[in-house]
Amino acid sequence: RDLTEKHPGEGATIIVHTLEEGTVYKDEEVTITAFLVDHEPVKPAYGYRFDTYGKSVVISGDTRPTQNLIKHAKGVDILVHEAYLPEHFDNVDSPEVAARLKYYHTSADEVGQVARDAGVKLLVLTHLIPANAEQTFLDRVGKYYKGKTIVGSDLMRF
């Protein structure tokens, strides 16, 4: 597009910031903490915790369940977590591909266990596979987590 539309090169500038587990941003209003999750073969992969004015949110990122995620989500106000239904992968992929996908994502049942073990106040499910099974996700999570669960959608506010 730059050749035909003559956009300035500055708009395409990418500045890479390498980070490690720990505080990645802090000011008088918010602290953002990155923590390692397991999304192998992607290494490193991070989840993030946001603490502001006595409230907290954790975003899991793509991950399988890990103790490190549970540790960083302990007692948070909101946990935003990906979830999948195992039978979906079984129905649309080869057994090998399905096994790989299940290895580095978190099933709805596992998300319920993570939320329970972390003692989160509100669980928001996101990055859902498949996207059209809201009640099934709620039922699976609810076997383990008795707190409030919301199936997320774009532009939701809390």
Locate the predicted segments by residue.
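Binuclear metal-dependent hydrolase catalytic cores
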Residues: 1-58, 138-158
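Cap/insert and terminal regions of metallo-dependent hydrolase folds
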Residues: 46-47, 53-58, 64-156
